[in-house]
């Protein structure tokens, strides 16, 4: 009988997932706030994908304490293999007997996290909004689940999950909550919280949070969860659009499969805009801008319920399949279906600016500017940028324009049905779209003429589409007027920006920021005063105005910049602010980072250290 060989597709895991596949995990954890640890056990059900040839199960771990391993209820021998940076320490579990193809075994691992865990952030009461209780949350993407529990930490493996979590404070997890009164142990003051995830998910979507959390309805299948003192304002921000977004995307793809769609608004040190943890999107409080202008983050994370969470990139080298598709769907939903087609183009223009910024950061010939990256031996976090989002979006938009929007609309549900519950790479995507359109001679001809290799492997910017600029022309004109000063007769008035959306003001500030013409410090200060920019509740606006001011050498933005850096941990804002601050006043940049580094999430802290010091500080 021939040996079964299943080549692994993911270079960022040390597990032998080509021989064993985890099909269900039960996670039993006690949240120990005093020790800043999770302690408990995880039970994997593994299916053999060989004919008894593999007698070892190798799992990813990173800085974990293992208490013991049982296989089918019996103690089993195990060992740590040599550590390999940046992937951690493989855990090798020995099996006493062969397991035939498609047979399953149960592996129970006793585990405690350590202070070196990269997936968890522990906040003191002082770091929360109402300053009453400690708080913890996880961020497992891309390869941080392995620092919570031993697993096959790859998006190429998906399994169902049960969570049994004990905590003195309310718990959120990436499963459907069992909505009954949690059982409380009177002696310890802790309660058991249970969640079930019946849709198979990859390890990076394992999520936990616990703290002083309350919930309020934002739709017929949705709640927002956050600190009690912020609950009303978060509810107001999200209740008008959440169900509208779900309905819009269901029309484009197919019905939502996860049961509930909820949003957890985290404390301000959360490093991303949002994380698409199933059933509970984790989101930054920076979207709560009191004007409902920043909730495109919710449209984006909701779109992940189809692209990414149901249909997943097989490895982080093909990350554009998650993020390019999600950005495409987000713009079809929050922009085209809610605001109209010109708004989709307006968002794409904002995205193009983010794309060029990322290209400039890496260098236009860098490997990380390709659609398909080479991550062998690399940390996927180092490649994280807007490139997979925006270059991916532009590729899909290009394909849409080639075949026509209505035909592309027929392809969308076909694609998401074909790979529902599966992981795929770029080559399978290419084969699928070519196959779908092969009977349509016109579309097939156009797709066969696409330079696929150039799109997949060429570094740098793709061709720029011919976007509808109607919503940006007015702010381009306003930027030109400012850049004509002091040599023109333009007199800035508050009326200049009346009627503009916050996102239009963002584009205005970006135009000023990228111009080779530099504002004087006096003009920068005037802009802030006349338009009220430094005082804006909308952090997208306030952060860009601070960058404009620093570029102009305007000392008046120094304190607002430092204040912003002390109250938000979202990398989208923190990293550019530090990069600009160090050019403006390196000493203050370093002092500010030293003051606030414990406020930032470990992922954010490591990235800013690289930005400021060139490499991670020891």
Curated annotation (Swiss-Prot):
- What's the protein called, per UniProt? Leucine aminopeptidase 2
Q: Is the keyword Isomerase assigned to this protein?
A: no
Q: Which family does the record assign?
A: Belongs to the peptidase M1 family.
As recorded in UniProt, coiled-coil segments are none
Comment on bound cofactor: Binds 1 zinc ion per subunit.
Q: Where in the cell is it found?
A: Cytoplasm; Nucleus
**Source species of the chain:** Aspergillus clavatus (strain ATCC 1007 / CBS 513.65 / DSM 816 / NCTC 3887 / NRRL 1 / QM 1276 / 107)
Which amino acids does the record list as binding a peptide?
Answer: 139-141, 271-276
Q: Molecular function (GO) terms listed?
A: aminopeptidase activity; epoxide hydrolase activity; metallopeptidase activity; zinc ion binding
Name the residues annotated as catalytic in the UniProt entry: 301 (proton acceptor), 389 (proton donor)
Cofactors per UniProt?
Answer: Zn(2+)
Q: What is its main location?
A: cytoplasm
Task: Tell me which EC number(s) this protein carries.
Answer: 3.4.11.-, 3.3.2.10
